[in-house]
């Protein structure tokens, strides 16, 4: 265990283009090799595509997609007397949102499509409609927690 103090949590500033903290978090997760402007352009293009296809507010759809992909419970490994149990635990709001964004980005990257913006737009629209890989991952996580409910008393 480290002897240093825990790193101070930095506040997430709203995105200058969309005035949304969630958009800033998404840009951070989209970014590769420190190329923030590229990540911002991908998100902006994805929102443009969503606006074209649905005609609605892309930011609202994005927030709905993140909400639909956010897990409420997860399983964590806990060793008790030589055996490892999958213990279901509640997920804090902050961690749940971070997991949802991570899943949305990773499943967007795994999709086959032309540009990253198109893949991201597709995944966000699917997630907003309670479909897509990110929502399936959340359901899987919830099923795992439900299946291991018997070990809930091992919570720490």
UniProtKB/Swiss-Prot annotation:
Pfam families noted in UniProt: Ribosomal_S7
PROSITE patterns for the chain: RIBOSOMAL_S7
Keyword Nucleotide-binding carried by entry: no
Keywords attached to this entry: Ribonucleoprotein, Ribosomal protein, RNA-binding, rRNA-binding, tRNA-binding
Protein known as: Small ribosomal subunit protein uS7
CDD domains on file: uS7_Bacteria
Gene: rpsG
Organism: Parasynechococcus marenigrum (strain WH8102)
Example GO BP: translation
């Amino acid at each position: 265990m480290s002897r240093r103090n825990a790193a101070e949590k930095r506040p997430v500033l709203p995105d200058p283009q969309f005035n949304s903290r969630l958009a800033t978090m998404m840009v951070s997760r989209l970014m590769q090799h420190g190329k923030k402007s590229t990540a911002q352009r991908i998100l902006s293009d994805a929102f443009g595509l969503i606006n074209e296809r649905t005609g609605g507010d892309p930011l609202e759809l994005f927030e709905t997609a993140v909400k639909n992909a956010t897990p409420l419970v997860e399983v964590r490994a806990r060793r008790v007397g030589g055996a490892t149990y999958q213990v279901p635990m509640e997920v804090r709001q902050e961690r749940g949102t971070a997991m949802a964004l991570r899943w949305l980005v990773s499943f967007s990257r795994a999709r086959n499509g032309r540009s990253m913006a198109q893949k991201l737009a597709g995944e966000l629209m699917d997630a907003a409609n309670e479909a897509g890989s990110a929502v399936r991952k959340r359901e899987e996580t919830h099923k795992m927690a439900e299946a291991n409910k018997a070990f809930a008393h091992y919570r720490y």
